[in-house]
C-alpha cells in the first residue's frame, strides 16, 4: 500500500517537460553540498514542478543553506560567490511563502540595475509558472503610467530598482501594507552611497513585522551598519572560503595601448569562444571599441548606461539568445547578469578596484562551470594588477602562447542551458506575460550559428584588419558616425582570418612588467 502511494506521488515527475541535462563539469563552488534535494525542503508541488522544468537538479550550497532558513521566517545576511545560485536561493522561498489567493504585493525584490531586474523577474516567472503567482517588474527609464496601470491588476511579487519603487510608493500607487518579505540582491551595491537612503525610505512603507533577506558577494561596512539597525537576530551565511570562482582561469597580457586591438583580434582567432563579454572603463570607449570590432568583421553588440532603456533591453535579450558572440559594455552588466553561454571575459580596460574585477570576471564560469578571464594591461595598470592580486588572494598569470581549451571549453557545446524560455523575455518592462496554464514553450537551441562569407569577402576583411588595427585608439573625440544597434549588424564569419604570420607578440606582453 505504501509503495503504491509513493509511486502515485511521483507520477507528476513523469509529466514534466525537463530540459536536456547539463553535462558540463562543475567545481566545488556548487558541488560542495550536504546532499539534500529540493524535496527535502517540503516545497509545494507546483513550485517543485517549476524548479525541475527550469533544469535544476540539486540545490547549490547557498540554496541549501538559505532556503530552509528563509522559509522559517528568519532574517538572512548571505554572502556567496557570483554565479553560485543566489537568485534561486531567495526566489524559491519567496514563491513558497507567497499566497496566490491574497491579491496584494507580498514580496519586494530590489536590485541595482534594470537588466538585473528583468532577469530576476523572469526567474520568478519561470520557477513559479505553476504557482498562479503574478510578478511585476518596475524600473526607471520606462513609462510610469504603464506601471501605475499594471498595479491595478493583482501583483504578488514586485521586482524593481530603488528609484522607481520609491516613486510608486511615495505616490501611494503601490500598496505595501501586506509586503512582509523584503529582499536585496547585490546588497553591497544597494546599500552604497547611491542607494542607501532610498532603501531606508522604502522600508518606511513596509509593515513593522517583516523579513529581510540580504544577498551579495561582498559586504562592506555600510552593510554591517544596515544589518545592526534593521535586521533582527539575522542568520549569517558565509560561503566565501575564497573570493574568486574556482572554475575561472585568469591571465594577463602586457600590451601597449596602441596594440590592444591587434591583441584582441589575435585572441579572437586563437580562442574557442562560445560567447564573450568585453569590459571598458568608459561609455565612450565602449562605443569606439564596438565600432572597431565590427569593422574587423566580428558581429558585436554594445551596452552602457547612456543608452535608451529600450535599446539596452534589446541588446541584452538578443545577446542572451545568441544572436552574436561578443558584447562590449561598461560596468553596467557586472552585477548579477547570468548568461550561461559566456565562457570568456576580457578586460580591455583593466578595472581600478578589486570589487569591480571580481564582479566582471564572475560573468563567466557561471554555476560552477569553467570560464576564462583575460586582462589587457599596460604600464599604468601594473600597480592595480598587483593590488587586486593581493586583495583577492589570487594569482593572475601571464598569458601563455596557447591556452588549454579544457580550462574553459565545454566538450559538448549543446549542453549549455538557457535558464528560461527566451520567447517570453519582455522587451519592455511589463509586456503581457504568458498565462500560468499556457503550454510550455519549446526548448531553445543554444548553439550560435555563424555562416562564413565568400572567400573574396574574407580577403577584403583581412586587408581591412591590417589597415585598421593600428588606428585604435585615436583621439576619442573623432567622429565615427551613428552607433550601430542590433538591427544594423550583420552576422560575420567567426573567427576571421588571423593576421598573416603574426601570432602573439610574446616579447611585448607575456612577461611581467619590471
Curated annotation (Swiss-Prot):
GO terms for biological process: mRNA processing; mRNA transport; regulation of translation. It comes from the Eukaryota. GO terms for cellular component: P-body. It is an enzyme of class 3 (hydrolase). A motif (DEAD box) lies at residues 185-188. It is found in: Cytoplasm, P-body. Residues 67-237 form the Helicase ATP-binding domain. GO terms for molecular function: ATP binding; ATP hydrolysis activity; RNA binding; RNA helicase activity. Keywords: ATP-binding, Cytoplasm, Helicase, Hydrolase, mRNA processing, mRNA transport, Nucleotide-binding, RNA-binding, Translation regulation, Transport. Residues 1-31, 427-514 are annotated as: Disordered. Residues 1-17, 504-514 have a biased composition (Polar residues). Its main location: cytoplasm. ATP binds at residues 80-87. Residues 247-407 form the Helicase C-terminal domain. Its EC number is 3.6.4.13. A motif (Q motif) lies at residues 36-64. SUPFAM superfamilies: P-loop containing nucleoside triphosphate hydrolases. Residues 429-494 have a biased composition (Low complexity). It catalyses: ATP + H2O = ADP + phosphate + H(+). The Q motif is unique to and characteristic of the DEAD box family of RNA helicases and controls ATP binding and hydrolysis. Belongs to the DEAD box helicase family. DDX6/DHH1 subfamily. PANTHER family: DEAD-BOX ATP-DEPENDENT RNA HELICASE 50. ATP-dependent RNA helicase involved in mRNA turnover, and more specifically in mRNA decapping. Is involved in G1/S DNA-damage checkpoint recovery, probably through the regulation of the translational status of a subset of mRNAs. May also have a role in translation and mRNA nuclear export. This is ATP-dependent RNA helicase DHH1. It comes from Kluyveromyces lactis (strain ATCC 8585 / CBS 2359 / DSM 70799 / NBRC 1267 / NRRL Y-1140 / WM37). The lineage of its organism: Eukaryota, Fungi, Dikarya, Ascomycota, Saccharomycotina.
